Amino acid sequence: MTIGPIENISGIPLGILGTHLGFLEALVPDDNGMLPRNTDGEFVIAAGARELIELSPVKIDLIQISSFGTTNPDEKDALIAAVRDLGLEPQLVMMVGGVNPMNPDDEDEALAQLMVNLGAALRNNIAQVNSTSVETWMEGTPPSSEEEFEARVAQNIKLHLRAYEEAGLAGSCIDNWNIEFLRPGEFQNFTSLAKLRPILTGLNEKIGSPFFKALIDAAHCGDSGLSISENEVIV
């Protein structure tokens, strides 16, 4: 049975996650900064997105793409163009790897990785950027005290403020930078909206506008140890 087109009347854009098409297989660059392609030479992400568009009776509007600072800039630009050719709005999820955003000694290298991704967003007129850049995925250590946690918050504010200022994001095409917290195990520090909120509040107070926001994943909220009502209050 063929399903006819279904109109999305919710007013909420429908998006897909590039990670569902594969992480190592589709998103992580090789040692030369090149992104995975299929046997036809097409980006794995673009090919998978096209298949989903063809299968879905509801129009798909956007795609989140995990983006690494080690990816060749020309590859980033080509992938963004490829998904736009499919009628999708690309949203970058900026990743940091091999550095600890909470460690002052790693600040310059973490900044360099963020700047590569922000540069791609600015070059390609992307309106929304996202990141998991407050902590290294699967490699963090829990804070030993409240004072250590507060120091990690302060270092993240310093790092992300530098990225905002040095990339020239004020008045740019980028409307918002949405930072994501992850479930315990993936992160060790910023594992709930309550723990992430001090970073966002501190950044927005410094720049004087609500530019930094939380990227909310309902599953991560459920794993965070906070109830639905507690999450609602913080949101």
Regions found by a protein language model. Give the residues of each.
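Active-site groove signature of glycoside hydrolases
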Residues: 120-145, 169-185
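Alpha-helix-loop-beta-strand connector modules within alpha/beta enzyme cores
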Residues: 80-98, 151-168, 197-206
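N-terminal pre-domain/capping segments
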Residues: 1-120, 205-212
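An active-site-proximal structural segment forming one wall of the substrate-binding cleft
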Residues: 104-127, 145-171
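Charged helix-capping and loop-helix junction motifs
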Residues: 77, 107-114, 146, 150, ...
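Acidic/histidine-rich catalytic cores of soluble enzymes
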Residues: 7, 29, 62-63, 164-235
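Short, flexible/disordered intra-domain loops and linkers
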Residues: 23-42, 101-106, 137-148, 186-191, ...
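Active-site-proximal loop/turn and secondary-structure-junction residues that shape catalytic pockets
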Residues: 20-23, 67-69, 96-99, 133-137, ...
